[in-house]
Regions:
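Bacterial Sec-dependent N-terminal signal peptides
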Residues: 1-24
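Residues within mature, well-folded domains
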Residues: 20-151
């Protein structure tokens, strides 16, 4: 009887594995939210397509409309002409440890008014690129000039 149960379990586990091979999300960057897979690139591209709804508004408005996923890290990008200001920030949706891997998807926000590098560095040094509630509050008041999604 025990042998029969073991053989049955083995057969069931093989059939479960073969069903996973037909995953429609294979090869795409995914985030699992409450046991539900979402296609991160497709989801974020919708914000880029509808950027007219967000340009000229504070970042908090965009973040409040992101109901399925939120940024986990922020990377401030200096302008090569003036390293005293941040003109763009990258928001990534994976952990800090995974954010430098190839093919990560990020949301690039160009700011209407440049952010002093000293302020961006303060948060970077304090939170080590992690997008905290404190940064959400700080950057949330900054006005969006443009939105671009990259992979």
């Amino acid at each position: 009887m025990h042998k029969f149960i073991l053989i049955l379990l083995l057969i069931l586990s093989v059939s479960v594995k073969s069903q996973n091979a037909d995953d429609p999300f294979e090869g795409k960057t995914l985030c699992i939210i409450r046991n539900k897979k979402i296609d991160t690139l497709t989801y974020l591209k919708q914000f880029e397509i509808n950027k007219a709804n967000y340009i000229g508004k504070p970042l908090a408005y965009l973040l409040n409309n992101m109901t399925q996923i939120q940024p986990k890290t922020i990377w401030s990008l200096p302008n090569f002409k003036s390293r005293r200001f941040v003109y763009s920030s990258q928001f990534r949706f994976v952990s800090k440890e995974n954010s430098l891997r190839q093919n990560n998807i990020f949301l690039l926000i160009d700011w209407q008014d440049p952010i002093p590098m000293s302020e961006a560095k303060y948060y970077k040094n304090k939170n080590h690129f992690i997008f905290t509630d404190e940064e959400r509050s700080y950057y949330g008041t900054k006005i969006i000039k443009d939105i671009i999604v990259h992979r």
